Curated annotation (Swiss-Prot):
Main location as per UniProt: mitochondrion
Function: Component of the ubiquinol-cytochrome c reductase complex (complex III or cytochrome b-c1 complex) that is part of the mitochondrial respiratory chain. The b-c1 complex mediates electron transfer from ubiquinol to cytochrome c. Contributes to the generation of a proton gradient across the mitochondrial membrane that is then used for ATP synthesis.
This protein's record includes keyword Membrane: yes
Family: Belongs to the cytochrome b family.
Ligand binding (a ubiquinone): 201
Cofactor binding summary note: Binds 2 heme b groups non-covalently.
Organism: Artibeus fimbriatus (Fringed fruit-eating bat)
Location in the cell: Mitochondrion inner membrane
Keyword tags: Electron transport, Heme, Iron, Membrane, Metal-binding, Mitochondrion, Mitochondrion inner membrane, Respiratory chain, Transmembrane, Transmembrane helix, Transport, Ubiquinone
Record-linked PANTHER family: CYTOCHROME B
Keyword Iron annotated: yes
Cofactors demanded by this protein: heme b
Recorded name of the encoding gene: MT-CYB
Protein name as it appears in the record: Cytochrome b
Length: 379
């Protein structure tokens, strides 16, 4: 008799995705981050659901409702800190996942890659709106500054900003709609994840060598299920350590002060995972130019497949490209650091230099280096 997992209409979909799925035998730990992102999404939806049961999206009570969750709700502090730090773990895994794709040439699966970029934008939007909900100082001023960027759009900018705000400033209407969208978006993200996996399973996984692995495949279960479980344990241990020992490490102290539209914080900045893009935004003195650079800093990923000039897919055997890749990583760390610093000398010039380098490496240096490597292959 045929196994039920191969005949049942629902189980056979799960079977072909997670059990009998043929996978390359050479996948390294860098291929763990997809499943880790799935766990992060699950943790965020669960903790968020329970937080939403106690949260009130009203400017008069939002801050107090968060305080109530932390002080009066059973294990409310744990839910709150798991959700806040879970977002940080989510972005750590996201950036490592994208970095893996860039290093090993996974962007050549263009459908999967483009859905991934959409996912990145959706998760960033979700995180931004979530940061506004506690209605602390940085929530309010962060929302004001970032939404105000849309006013740089010619002709419709001002109307668009007021439409998003629901008035002439960030107020009750803004908070209510941000809560509604923050609740809705993770489910849209979940749907996009399914599409992402659908396209991935059409082509099969890439592997570290970048060459087709059709002759050497192994079943996903038990090999990669066990490997993923180890990844879960490592990540959840890291998250638990962060939450239980240093829960405010990645947060901003200003957000423990209730929002006050009469007092501007000395330095308005977003959460750490947006600082690289924020630094690029600030490095351009023109408002519209800054907004375009901000959007392009992420959207540039969409043209990476077009810029692939190498005869080899992966960077595994391309030492010159490897050097450039790690230079790009160093530039991103520099931008993240600069984004958290005040706008003064020498941070301004460092930020501008790093921003130019970021675009220069991706748009020119990497394709040119690939052509040089192609030439060296002839020797």
């Amino acid at each position: 008799m045929t196994n039920i997992r191969k005949t049942h209409p629902l189980l056979k979909i799960i079977n072909s995705s997670f059990v009998d799925l043929p996978a390359p035998s050479s996948l390294s730990s860098w291929w763990n981050f997809g499943s880790l992102l799935g766990i992060c999404l699950g943790v965020q939806i669960l903790t968020g659901l329970f937080l939403a049961m106690h949260y009130t999206s009203d400017t008069a009570t939002a801050f107090n409702s968060v305080t109530h969750i932390c002080r009066d709700v059973n294990y409310g502090w744990l839910l709150w800190y798991l959700h806040a730090n879970g977002a940080s773990m989510f972005f750590i895994c996201l950036y490592l996942h994208v970095g893996r794709g860039l290093y090993y040439g996974s962007y050549m699966y263009s459908e999967t890659w483009n859905i991934g970029i959409l996912l990145l934008f959706a998760v960033m939007a979700t995180a931004f709106m979530g940061y506004v909900l506690p209605w602390g100082q940085m929530s309010f001023w962060g929302a004001t500054v970032i939404t105000n960027l849309l006013s740089a759009i010619p002709y419709i900018g001002t109307d668009l900003v007021q439409w998003i705000w629901g008035g002439f400033s960030v107020d009750k209407a803004t908070l209510t709609r941000f809560f509604a969208f923050h609740f809705l978006l993770p489910f849209i993200v979940t749907a996009l994840v399914m599409v992402h996996l659908l396209f991935l399973h059409e082509t099969g996984s890439n592997n570290p060598t970048g060459i087709p692995s059709d002759p050497d495949m192994i079943p996903f279960h038990p090999y990669y299920t066990i490997k993923d479980i180890l990844g879960f344990l490592v990540m959840l241990t890291a998250l638990a350590t962060l939450v239980l020992f240093s829960p405010d490490l990645l947060g901003d102290p200003d957000n423990y002060i209730p929002a006050n539209l009469l007092i501007t914080p000395p330095h308005i900045k977003p959460e750490w995972y947006f600082l690289f893009a924020y630094a690029i935004l600030r490095s351009i003195p023109n408002k519209l130019g800054g907004v375009l650079a901000l959007v392009m800093s992420i959207l540039i990923l969409a043209i990476v497949p077009v810029l692939h000039m190498s005869k080899q897919r992966s960077m595994m055997f391309r030492p010159l490209s490897q050097c450039l890749f790690w230079l790009l990583v160093a530039v991103l760390f520099t931008l993240t650091w600069i984004g958290g610093q005040p706008v003064e000398h020498p941070y301004i010039i460092i930020g501008q230099t790093a921003s130019v380098l970021y675009f220069l490496i991706i748009l020119f240096l990497m394709p040119m280096t690939s052509l040089v490597e192609n030439y060296l292959l002839k020797w």
